[in-house]
């Protein structure tokens, strides 16, 4: 299992994944990224025409690489720090001895 997959599985199991996802969504909205991607999708659809031959999957394939490059580095760093904090906190909790009451 890759480190990325292990972190993903761990955050799902601890319930932290939804917190990280909520943080990401709010930050992307705050910086205007969502509006930018929405406009990019609209422009691609206008460019391709309205003949219904362009599928959602094709749109996603075309937009995803461009959209990823538009995510500000500050947001990427913030999320990475949040994930590290979560992993560190949970590792420290796992290292603490059990209370034998």
From Swiss-Prot:
Name any GO cellular component annotation.
nuclear periphery
* Xref: Pfam families: EnY2
Q: Which UniProt keywords apply?
A: Activator, Chromatin regulator, Cytoplasm, mRNA transport, Nucleus, Protein transport, Transcription, Transcription regulation, Translocation, Transport
Cell compartment(s), UniProt: Nucleus, Nucleoplasm; Cytoplasm
One BP annotation, GO:
poly(A)+ mRNA export from nucleus
Which InterPro entries did the record assign? TF_ENY2 (IPR018783), TF_EnY2_sf (IPR038212)
MF annotations from Gene Ontology: C2H2 zinc finger domain binding; chromatin insulator sequence binding; TFIID-class transcription factor complex binding; transcription coactivator activity
Q: What is its main location?
A: nucleus
Family in the record: Belongs to the ENY2 family.
The record ties this protein, via PANTHER family, to: ENHANCER OF YELLOW 2 TRANSCRIPTION FACTOR
Q: What does this protein do?
A: Involved in mRNA export coupled transcription activation by association with both the AMEX and the SAGA complexes. The SAGA complex is a multiprotein complex that activates transcription by remodeling chromatin and mediating histone acetylation and deubiquitination. Within the SAGA complex, participates in a subcomplex that specifically deubiquitinates histone H2B. The SAGA complex is recruited to specific gene promoters by activators, where it is required for transcription. Required for nuclear receptor-mediated transactivation.
The annotated subunit structure for this chain is: Component of the nuclear pore complex (NPC)-associated AMEX complex (anchoring and mRNA export complex), composed of at least e(y)2 and xmas-2. Component of the SAGA transcription coactivator-HAT complexes, at least composed of Ada2b, e(y)2, Pcaf/Gcn5, Taf10 and Nipped-A/Trrap. Within the SAGA complex, e(y)2, Sgf11, and not/nonstop form an additional subcomplex of SAGA called the DUB module (deubiquitination module). Component of the THO complex, composed of at least e(y)2, HPR1, THO2, THOC5, THOC6 and THOC7. Interacts with e(y)1. Interacts with su(Hw) (via zinc fingers).
Name this polypeptide is given: Enhancer of yellow 2 transcription factor
Q: What is the scientific name of the source organism?
A: Drosophila erecta (Fruit fly)
Identify the gene encoding this protein. e(y)2
